Amino acid sequence: MNPSVSGSLRNKLRRCQTKDAYRFLKKIRRHEKSKSPKKELAKQYSELSALMANSIAIAESKEHLIPNPITYPKGLPVSAKAAEIRGLLENNQVIIVSGDTGSGKTTQLPKICLDAGYGRRGLIGHCQPRRLAATSVASRIAEELNSPIGALVGFQVRFNERISESCCVKLMTDGILLSEIQSDAYLSKYEVIIVDEAHERSLLSLIHI
């Protein structure tokens, strides 16, 4: 494959959905080593380019669903620290946020992640220890973002799911995420994982961490 063509495809990877990026990278590497005739390589390039364009379009289509600006309830300690937390997210792979009950961690952290640019290429996963918490928190965040449940914010628990392709934030129980790890060890569909109530130190939350 022509180096300029290869470079063009690699540059597009950072705009593709995270769940597609590794698969596309493997295809690019395979094409780079291919000894196929130029005509066949051109066909392969065209097909891969179309797949990548579709993945990019899906990621970019989420942008119009996200409120601009994202607002935070006044009076919550986490709201007052939103800019600081956003900066930490942008510069660290792992952060720990500690605060009193009612400080806004559960409902505001996913919004801060959205504000930091996450949730477009991959989901913001938000783990809760119980099914009721997952569904109620999803409804609350969706309400604050003025979005119907299942559109921008969705949830998945045992026997119940409200998720669409447009979702940026996914609430779930620890068990759901653990089951996904079995089929996707890298959790490639997620850009961010929030483990709430981590202080409970269940076996599942320890595995996630």
Locations of the language-model features?
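Helicase-associated low-complexity/disordered flanking segments
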Residues: 1-86, 91
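Walker A/P-loop
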Residues: 93-109
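Walker A/P-loop NTP-binding motif
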Residues: 107-119
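Short basic/glycine-enriched coil/helix segment immediately N-terminal to the Walker B
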Residues: 164-166, 181-192
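Conserved small/polar residues in nucleotide/adenosyl-binding loops
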Residues: 207-209
